[in-house]
């Protein structure tokens, strides 16, 4: 199956479904794909999120993403199963280009996402001495975005230095 294209299917479940039923839906669609000749490469529960626009009477939905590989015939079987259940309020399958995703199964609940955000935006308080020897309190933010931005600036600076060196070599 390595020469076959791979696909990503994102589907949205009703927000009122209990978490154990969400797991059973994921297992059900994985079995349907495999029985139709496809291979599941990755599955991710994205959790409950607000919809961009209401679908039916729902303003929220539980997002699930499936990455799968096959000859394309398995997609019709999967989408037919999704169309026939009332729990799936929307689905979309897209053919992907590029390298295959790593094969894994990740389940993320809403509680874990909130805990991760709290850890990412954690502030620490440290005591530093100023020049006079007096203690002063400083706060250091450990926001991942600021670290990523700083690393990005460093990468840009390094790239410019390399580019300048290459220009100097060409001039010599």
UniProtKB/Swiss-Prot annotation:
The family database entries (InterPro entries) matched by this protein are listed as: Ribosomal_bS6 (IPR000529), Ribosomal_bS6_sf (IPR035980), Ribosomal_S6_plastid/chlpt (IPR020814), Transl_elong_EF1B/ribsomal_bS6 (IPR014717)
GO cellular-component term (any): ribonucleoprotein complex
Q: Region annotation Disordered: residue ranges?
A: 100-172
The UniProt keywords, alphabetically, are: Ribonucleoprotein, Ribosomal protein, RNA-binding, rRNA-binding
Ribonucleoprotein as UniProt keyword: yes
Q: Where is the composition biased (Basic and acidic residues)?
A: 107-172
Q: Single GO molecular-function term?
A: structural constituent of ribosome
The record's Gene Ontology biological-process terms are: translation
Cited function: Binds together with bS18 to 16S ribosomal RNA.
Q: Which family does it belong to?
A: Belongs to the bacterial ribosomal protein bS6 family.
Matching entries from NCBIfam families are given as: S6 (TIGR00166)
Name listed for the protein in its UniProt record: Small ribosomal subunit protein bS6
Species per Swiss-Prot/TrEMBL record: Prochlorococcus marinus (strain MIT 9211)
Q: What is the lineage of its organism?
A: Bacteria, Bacillati, Cyanobacteriota, Cyanophyceae, Synechococcales
